[in-house]
A protein has these predicted regions:
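Catalytic centers of hydrolytic enzymes
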Residues: 1-179
């Protein structure tokens, strides 16, 4: 994958960032499934910061979220259990992910493990268990293979941002705190 430098963004830039041909999907998920996904996402995250400011241990499977905020406590060893193929099985022990909040009507409220939420992502993670995300594979899908992930971002930039990505997108939004 590539990164996008400051300046004009082209369709080729977007395709180089999202080159895999994944499709947007949306499903219903319980708060417990979301908590498991977050825990799986941060299993290898360590406190030591790399030169680019990201925590050591992040991978392509590290979830970038919207509508959620949470803290990763790197002093806690991962208790994520995976099978011999690297697929998520369970969390057996204390969780590294703490203080998970869901945005609802412009307010933040603690996630409810029993509640049902709507999750949007690409089919690779949600349906195909990519990067080991097994928790959503059998869920009920609201939207299935809507459009290519790079096309979703192109549409958002063109149709909702008027083709201008503002300064607010250049800095972290504070949704993920690493301690």
């Amino acid at each position: 994958r590539a990164t996008i430098k400051k300046g004009d963004i082209t369709t080729a830039n977007m395709i180089s960032v999202h080159p895999y041909g994944n499709y947007l999907c949306s499903c219903y998920a319980t708060g417990a499934e979301i908590l498991d996904a977050l825990e799986h996402s941060v299993a290898n995250t360590q406190a030591v910061a790399a030169q680019d400011g990201k925590a050591v241990g992040e991978s392509g499977g590290f979830l970038q979220v919207s509508g959620l905020k949470f803290t990763i406590d790197t002093s806690i060893p991962s208790s994520v259990k995976k099978d011999d193929k690297g697929l998520f099985v369970d969390v057996e022990g204390e969780r590294k992910v703490k203080d998970v909040y869901v945005e609802k009507n412009g307010e933040w409220e603690p996630i409810d493990p029993e509640a049902t939420y709507t999750v949007a992502c690409h089919n690779y993670m949600l349906q195909d268990m990519g990067d080991g995300y097994t928790m959503f594979a059998d869920n009920q899908y609201i939207l299935d293979n809507v459009m290519l992930d790079n096309q979703v971002i192109i549409t958002y930039i063109c149709d909702f941002l008027g083709g201008n990505v503002g300064e607010e997108y250049s800095a972290p939004q504070g949704r993920i705190t690493i301690i």
